[in-house]
């Protein structure tokens, strides 16, 4: 089960790094900065890095890889779409609050808005993320779009999602560097005080987290098989007339770990065979 174990290593590593990134952000603002608050001061600004890291980076990363979790392959595709969209919506709400915090802080302190490259790219990627969310729900979650349209737009949907995710991480790295340059005076950033080392390490953590997420979602062997393949691999599915035959296709809570591992590995082998034969669509 080499493929399954490799996936688990990547998955656990990414989750640990993502969670560690959130912890690093909290330690940064609570220990070295002014803490958290909502009074128009620096403590309100500190919500910006905390919410961007936890929502726009960590939760978005989970939303991207949720289809790759083998133990969810017995869940219905519709259920997974709701989970995928729900996680993205949660990340978007976090991001909006983060934007409100930084604009509120700037306005309270008479600091100009939207003058840095960080702010330009940051606002652009938020708008693109909102557009991606609206189009994704309209095309893939609501039952109005044709299957041909969904299949045709899937490569664009995947590419734009990964592009947005990578841009978010790059923008976050720009932002934390900008914050350190502005904030560290005695000693300056160039002298590498403990805060600088700590925050630089935080930047490396979210960078590696993003790399692991992209690797997992672009590895063909770890792709969720189509619904027909899942049913073929699972002998206990409901019959066409609706009679019960021990189906787990819509209930993923009772699947044994050994069955998940077996089915996931068999599914990957099936996917690779289809890829080699040129039979598999972009879905």
Swiss-Prot record:
Its EC number is 7.2.1.3. CDD domains: Cyt_b561_CYBRD1. It is found in: Cell membrane; Apical cell membrane. Binds 2 heme b groups non-covalently. Residues 13-218 form the Cytochrome b561 domain. L-ascorbate binds at residues 77, 81, 150. Residues 254-263 have a biased composition (Basic and acidic residues). The chain crosses the membrane at residues 6-30, 46-67, 77-103, 117-142, 150-177, 196-220. Residues 1-5, 68-76, 143-149, 221-283 are cytoplasmic. GO terms for cellular component: apical plasma membrane; brush border membrane; membrane. Residues 235-253 have a biased composition (Polar residues). Fe(3+) binds at residue 106. It is a multi-pass membrane protein. One of its GO terms (biological process) is ascorbate homeostasis. This is Plasma membrane ascorbate-dependent reductase CYBRD1. It comes from Xenopus tropicalis (Western clawed frog).
């Amino acid at each position: 089960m080499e493929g399954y174990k490799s996936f688990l290593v990547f998955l656990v590593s990414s989750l640990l790094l993502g969670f560690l990134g959130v912890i690093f952000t909290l330690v940064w603002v609570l220990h070295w900065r002014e803490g958290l608050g909502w009074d128009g001061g620096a403590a309100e600004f500190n919500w910006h890095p905390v919410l961007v890291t936890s929502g726009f980076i960590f939760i978005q990363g989970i939303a991207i890889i949720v289809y790759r979790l083998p133990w969810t392959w017995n869940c219905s595709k519709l259920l997974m779409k709701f989970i995928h969209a729900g996680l993205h919506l949660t990340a978007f709400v976090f991001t909006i609050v983060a934007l409100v915090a930084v604009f509120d802080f700037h306005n309270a302190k008479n600091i100009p808005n939207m003058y840095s490259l960080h702010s330009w790219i940051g606002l652009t990627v938020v708008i693109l993320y909102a557009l991606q969310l609206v189009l994704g729900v309209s095309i893939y979650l609501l039952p109005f779009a044709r299957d041909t349209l969904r299949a045709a737009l899937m490569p664009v949907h995947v590419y734009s999602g990964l592009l947005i995710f990578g841009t978010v991480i790059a923008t976050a790295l720009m932002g934390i560097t900008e914050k350190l340059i502005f904030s560290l005076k005695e000693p300056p950033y160039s002298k590498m005080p403990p805060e600088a080392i700590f925050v630089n390490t935080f930047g490396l953590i979210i960078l590696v987290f993003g790399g692991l997420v992209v690797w997992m979602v672009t590895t063909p062997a770890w792709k969720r098989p189509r619904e027909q393949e899942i049913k073929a691999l699972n002998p206990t599915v409901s019959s066409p007339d609706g009679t019960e035959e021990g189906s787990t296709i819509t209930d993923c809570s009772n699947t044994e770990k050994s069955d998940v591992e077996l089915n996931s590995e068999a599914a990957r082998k099936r996917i690779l065979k289809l890829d080699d034969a040129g039979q598999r669509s972009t879905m």
